[in-house]
Amino acid sequence: MGSLSSSISSLFLKEFFGAFFLSMRYFFRQKATINYPFEKGPVSPRFRGEHALRRYPNGEERCIACKLCEAICPAQAITIEAGPRRNDGTRRTVRYDIDMVKCIYCGFCQEACPVDAIVEGPNFEFATETREELYFDKARLLDNGDRWEREIARNIAIDSPYR
């Protein structure tokens, strides 16, 4: 009896038609894929991408050279050199470098920063041809902050109830 039912199933191509109708059901639905370089999917506000140093609205850099991000970085990818104290008693950085080859994008630097100076922005397209280009200095980080400030501020505002 088993061989008779298997013969009938194979004769009528039961599995083939089942797979065909399943394919046809999904063929006419909306596509789940996107054409990547030309279309981009949504990015979460908590996405951790390329690092950036932010500025205050008056143009002054936010980093106060407390070195908390350097101390908490598990990959030891951040190097900070603080300048002398200013007349108002605050400090600013003379050197702020991040070795993106070492960075593991954990976000601890962003969480440790008391003034939201160092953030991981929404940019994920920063591939390079050499390793040296992945060594971000202070000028590059400030440029990233200026370029992505609107998106970074929006993401921080969206995420603020959970911080």
UniProtKB/Swiss-Prot annotation:
[4Fe-4S] cluster 1 binds at C63, C66, C69, C113. Its cofactor is [4Fe-4S] cluster. It catalyses: a quinone + NADH + 5 H(+)(in) = a quinol + NAD(+) + 4 H(+)(out). Residues 53-83, 94-123 form the 4Fe-4S ferredoxin-type domain. It comes from Rhizobium leguminosarum bv. trifolii (strain WSM2304). This is NADH-quinone oxidoreductase subunit I. Its main location: membrane. GO terms for biological process: aerobic respiration. Keywords: 4Fe-4S, Cell inner membrane, Cell membrane, Iron, Iron-sulfur, Membrane, Metal-binding, NAD, Quinone, Repeat, Translocase, Ubiquinone. It is found in: Cell inner membrane. InterPro entries: 4Fe4S_Fe-S-bd (IPR017896), 4Fe4S_Fe_S_CS (IPR017900), NADH_quinone_OxRdtase_chainI (IPR010226). Binds 2 [4Fe-4S] clusters per subunit. Its EC number is 7.1.1.-.
